[in-house]
């Protein structure tokens, strides 16, 4: 099991056990930042840790906060087993 899988597993477990989704999101973002810093450090060994942190924070600040999505409509169809459903996208 590699490190990123372990971190993702820990983040998911903390999200399930924690009461706040924002808290879990902050943990995942922090872990992602740390992973980016380590990867960037391995690629750019001549940079200092402070420069790496500033670059990563600038990259994160430039990203949009919301995900843009097109409106879609779906129809749910139950299959023979009550545990399975099929989503059919309606073309409009």
Swiss-Prot record:
List keywords of the entry alphabetically.
Host cytoplasm, Host nucleus, Secreted, Signal, Virulence
Q: Where in the cell is it found?
A: Secreted; Host nucleus; Host cytoplasm
| GO cellular component: a single term | host cell nucleus
Q: Where is the signal peptide?
A: 1-21
Is-annotated flag, keyword Glycoprotein? no
Renumbered to this chain, motif RxLR spans 30-33
Disulphide-bridged cysteine pairs: none
Q: Which domain of life is it from?
A: Eukaryota
Keyword RNA-binding set for record: no
Q: What does the UniProt entry state concerning the protein's domains?
A: Has the canonical translocation RxLR motif, but lacks the canonical EER motif, which characterizes most oomycete effectors identified so far.
What does the UniProt record say this protein does? Secreted effector that completely suppresses the host cell death induced by cell death-inducing proteins.
Q: Belongs to which family?
A: Belongs to the RxLR effector family.
Q: What name is this protein filed under?
A: Secreted RxLR effector protein 21
Species per Swiss-Prot/TrEMBL record: Plasmopara viticola
The top of its lineage is: Eukaryota, Sar, Stramenopiles, Oomycota, Peronosporales
Gene designation: RXLR21
């Amino acid at each position: 099991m590699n490190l990123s899988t372990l971190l993702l597993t820990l983040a998911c477990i903390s999200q399930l056990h924690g009461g706040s989704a924002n808290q879990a999101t902050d943990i995942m973002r922090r872990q992602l930042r740390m992973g980016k810093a380590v990867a960037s450090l391995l690629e750019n060994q001549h940079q200092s840790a402070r420069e790496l942190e500033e670059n990563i924070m600038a990259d994160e600040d430039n990203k949009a906060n919301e995900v843009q999505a097109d409106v879609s409509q779906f129809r749910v169809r139950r299959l023979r087993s009550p545990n399975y459903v099929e989503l059919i996208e309606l073309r409009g």
